[in-house]
From Swiss-Prot:
Pathway where it operates: tRNA modification
Principal location class: cytoplasm
Signal peptide location: none
GO cellular component term of the entry, any: cytoplasm
The species this protein was found in: Pseudomonas paraeruginosa (strain DSM 24068 / PA7) (Pseudomonas aeruginosa (strain PA7))
Xref: PANTHER family: AMINOTRAN_5 DOMAIN-CONTAINING PROTEIN, SULFURTRANSFERASE-RELATED
Miscellaneous section: The thiolation reaction likely consists of two steps: a first activation step by ATP to form an adenylated intermediate of the target base of tRNA, and a second nucleophilic substitution step of the sulfur (S) atom supplied by the hydrosulfide attached to the Fe-S cluster.
Record-listed [4Fe-4S] cluster binding positions: 115, 118, 206
Keyword field contains Zinc-finger: no
Gene assigned in the entry: ttcA
Pfam families: ATP_bind_3 (PF01171)
Protein name stated in the entry: tRNA-cytidine(32) 2-sulfurtransferase
Chain ranges for the short sequence motif PP-loop motif as given in the UniProt record: 40-45
């Protein structure tokens, strides 16, 4: 890649700045951390690795980066692509082999969504491997749009008000998951991926499942953004400004104990000046 144009330079600086802000805001990476960067071969994880490698050079703290890819034994998976790329940029890496493809195909009927089971199997394997290599943080490539899509998926189809947190302590208590691209838009990541010419590997399991609920939500959000530019950013900001007293979850706010405050100053209506 040659010299960047003005717009390309702005794009790179914006992604680096937003990732740095997210890392700082949520204290994602600390001095001495060993960060396991989960690399799928998609645009998001390539971009995350690229940005983390840059931040590693300029950050005031020291931390290790180890790239990890999980070979799920999907038919036609180009096993040489990631090792060649990671060797070319001088990054320590591991390839974890686990035939989750066969398990998913056996358990999920033809035509049904494989994403949920596939992600659970992959997550469990990666948690175990992170523990084995002594990783203190596990970095995933989810971006702002992923977080918003998950929010609406849970609300529309699950009846819960939750999304993907930028930082998460796993249920096992032994893994801390971080999402450095939490503030970054998919549009910017797509443009950056094309700019950097990452060797993208498509997913044979879920890449062709056009009728997924997530795809429906994604198209809804894209349409909203087309009609009202900036709406996506505003909605994400809302996830950072939660007011439990204005919702209806009794576990988050004690509605039952609300009483009139007898010591409060009374309000008098001046009927003469109405």
């Amino acid at each position: 890649m040659g010299t960047l144009s003005v717009n390309q330079n702005k794009l790179q600086k914006r992604l680096r700045r937003l990732a740095g802000e997210a890392i700082t805001d949520f204290n994602m990476i600390e001095d001495g951390d060993k960060v396991m960067v989960c690399l799928s071969g998609g645009k998001d994880s390539y971009t995350m690795l690229d940005i983390l490698l840059y931040l590693q050079k300029v950050a005031p703290i020291r931390f290790e980066i180890v790239a990890v890819n999980m070979d799920q034994k999907q038919p036609g998976f180009p096993e040489h692509v990631l090792p060649e790329y990671l060797k070319s940029i001088g990054v320590e890496y591991h390839i974890v082999e686990k035939d989750t493809y066969s398990v998913v195909k056996e358990k999920i009927p033809e035509g049904k969504t494989t994403c949920s089971l596939c992600s659970r199997l992959r997550r469990g394997t990666l948690y175990t491997f992170a523990d084995e290599i002594g990783a203190t943080k596990m970095a995933l490539g989810h971006h702002r749009d992923d977080i918003l899509e998950t929010f609406f998926l849970n609300m529309f189809y699950g009846g819960t008000l939750k999304a993907m947190p930028p930082k998460l302590l796993a249920d096992d208590g032994r893994n801390v998951v971080i999402r450095p691209l939490a503030y970054c838009s998919e549009k910017d990541i797509e443009a950056y991926s094309q700019l950097k010419e990452f060797p993208i590997i498509p997913c044979n399991l879920c890449g062709s499942q056009e009728n997924l609920q997530r795809q429906v939500v994604k198209e809804m959000l894209l349409e909203w953004e087309r009609k009202s530019p900036g709406r996506t950013e505003i909605m994400f900001r809302a996830l950072q400004n939660v007011v439990p007293s204005q919702l209806a979850d009794r576990n988050l706010f004690d509605f039952a104990s609300l009483r009139i405050d007898e010591s409060a100053t009374p309000r008098f209506l001046d009927v003469m000046n109405l």
